[in-house]
Every structure is written in structure tokens, then in C-alpha cells.
Amino acid sequence: MRPNVLLVVLDTARADAFEPYGALAGTTPTVAQMASASNGFVHRAMYSTACWTLPAHASLFTGRLPRSAGFAKGTPPVFKHAMDAYPVDTLPDALRRAGYDTAGLSANPWISEATGFDRGFERFQMLETDRNKEMDGKRRRDRAAWLLDALRARADDGAVAIEHLLAEWLRARTKQPFFWFVNLMECHSPYLPPKPYSPAGPIGRVRAARDAARHCTLDALWRVGAGGWDIDDGALQRMRAMYDGAIRQLDAWLARVFEHLDEAHVLEDTVVIVTSDHGENFGEDHKFGHTFSLDDRLLHVPFITRGPVSIDLHAVASLADVPGALARTLGVPSGAFDDVDAPRGVAVAQLDAVGDEGDERVDAAVERWGLPESAKKFFFTSYACATDGAIKLVRRRGYEEVFVLATDPLEQAPIRMDETVDARFADELAPLRRALDAAAASEAAPIDDDADDADHDGDAGAAEVSALEKQMRLLGYL
């Protein structure tokens, strides 16, 4: 019988927050034990295909780069339309056809029925988090609610509820193999882990919550991305400390899930995959959050597995490689993932413009922030990058630049392309250029934003959209 699969996405978790990728010993003991187990594996050069949740998950489920299937940009209804209209099997589709029990649990409002990511799952549930439940009425619309939560230090972002559901499913399961997907939001802003994982007392937590309330709104993140840096070192340190506490919380969660698998006598028959959709910046090169950048703090994600089979991936891989590799490993028909645009041995990522030139919203925002006209380029520029883990090639607006990651890990010293540079890096650049050319050639027409108003069969209902909006407010997006 085929093995079970538990795919856990730790939203916003950067690779270097975990011991196998350089974090201090004792930071993530469960992940460290996964990596060192006789049936464990660490992929040291796994990259996301985007710097934010929706396109990254689209790649993880379809095996394609975001633009290739129309997942480049758009609102939740646009993504739902793209997922519903996707012409071949997604990973959950393929595993369901192969006889797997497919189920998903998400604490992330972006990964929900409202955005189409329930496709292929027999059961899918987006959970209302403890933090959401504790903040009712007007408070739910006010980021001051984060201050209240900071004092209480008891609410989580859905991990406990998801753990309980997994335990229930394990008790009720049949002999049918399962593919269960989980998305956890503990280390996403506002970075407020509950006791005992919080590194600060009540006063420190309130200060960290105030920092998040100021700097984690969409308006603030875009302002910083456009060059309006205004975050002091103390705020960065407080938020990073809370983020690291959330990482420890997730590591402890994984330990309990392993216990549940063991108690259900399926641990040795289950492939557990721990990864992320993207990372997070905390002031490196004056970057914060996960906007307007394809730097390695955002793209380099953890990928650790433990189980009876090993997933065959190239030494350098991206989330778009995972569906095909997993399907082949499980002996599941993988035709939907074999003839894809994602290059092998090179990781490509894409970032799309927020708006088009002349967008009045962008004009008003740049004027409100007091930034120069040149700041608008951050909103209007789409670009892509390719890396072999040592060299990163960035292509934007008709020009290329190179980063040598060994000597420039923060990517602060771009090397503009000329004949000398081209000759110096000729061997390294050739496969990266081929990858970017192939990705560009495979781009699908983007879904029109008018899809927001279209009457698509199976569109999420008012309840799902309301739940999405409610949780997005708590994350600072609205």
C-alpha cells in the first residue's frame, strides 16, 4: 500500500530560522530530529516561486510557475476562477484519483474555499483562529486588538485547533492512505506567540504588538517597499524575537503531531513534509515583511521530510518541482506535472506589478508618503529571477543584473550586465537565462480582474468571503 502524506506549510517561515539551516542548537529540536533521523532528509536549496502566499501555493499544487497558469496576480475571486479553470490535475486531484483520502486544514485566509484552494480535497476547512474568536465586534476591525492579545498571551493562530482535528482524523481513519495538507499561520505577523513561547513579558509583548500594529499594515509595508524606510532597530529586534518564539511554538506543535501519528500506529507509514511558502525580512537591506522583493530571505524556504520513502528532487529545486517529484515517489500517475515549464536544477521566482502606470491609487499613495516619483517603479515593475544556489540572475524591464550569493548574501551589490560581466559568468548564466526564457515563453494570459464580478459556478459564498475578510483584518491586510 502507498504511504500516507502529511504536508505541513509553515506560512512565512524562512529557512534560516531552523536548525538544519543554521539556527542555534535547541531552537527547533523537532525539526532537527526529523533531519537527523535515518529516514529523514533536508533539502538545503529549496526555493519558493514567489514572495507571497497565493502564487507560491499555486506552484506547490500545480507544479507550474505562477504566470504559466494565470496565477500571477489578482484578488481572491480571480485566483478562485484560475484554480477552478485549471485544465489538468492539481496535486490533490492526482492523489485523490489514485485512491488517497484528501483533506486540507488551513488557518490562512488566503488558502481557503474563497480562493479555490479546496480543489481536489474531499474535505477542506479554513479555521477561525483563537485570536479571531477573542476579538469580536469593533475590536476585530481595529489593530488595537493586537495589544489586548499581547496582554493575554493565550490566543494562537489556529495551530491548536488543527492539531485536535488531525488527532480526530487519525482516530477515525480507515486503511485508505491519506494525503492531508495543513497551513499554519503562527509566524506570520503580528508575531504574537502565546505562553510559554513568547520571549517577552506583558510590557515587552505590548511593545511588540504596537510595533506590529504600526509596521505590518499593508499601507506601511508598501511604503517601506517603495523606499520609505521608517522602522527603528528596537522595533525590528522585538518583532524578530517574537517571530522566533512563534517558530519554537510550531516546532513544539510538530512534536505533538508526531506523537499523534505514533499513537495511531501510522508514523512509520507516513511521509511528513515540512516546508514554507515564503520567508520574512526583518530589516536586512532595509527590507521588511514579504513585499516587493525576490531576495533569498523570502525565497529560500525549509524543506524537511521524514518517512518511509525519499522524494527525489534536484540539488536546487523550487516548490514547483514538488508535485511531480512527490507523485513519482508515490507511484501516482504524474502526467499533469511531467510536461511543465518549471526548469530542472534551477529555481525560478516571479514578482508581478501591483498596478499599472497611471494607477490613481499608486499616485495618491506616493504623494501621501512624501516619496519621489521614482518610488512608483516599485508598484509598476514586474520581474523574475533564477538561481543555482550560488548565482542569482535578476531580469527586469529589459535589463539584467547578477548577485554572487557567497560574497553578497544580502544581495546589496548587484552587478549590472555588460560584456565583461557576461564573459566572466558565461557558464553560470547560460542555464539561468534558459530557465528565464522558458518561463517567459510559457506565460499564460492573466485572468482579467473583471473575474471579480463574474458569476462562476462554485464561487465561494458570502460566509466564506466574510470569514476571509475578517481574518485578513487581523493580519493587517485590511
Describe these PLM feature segments:
Residues 1-478:
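Catalytic domains that recognize anionic headgroups
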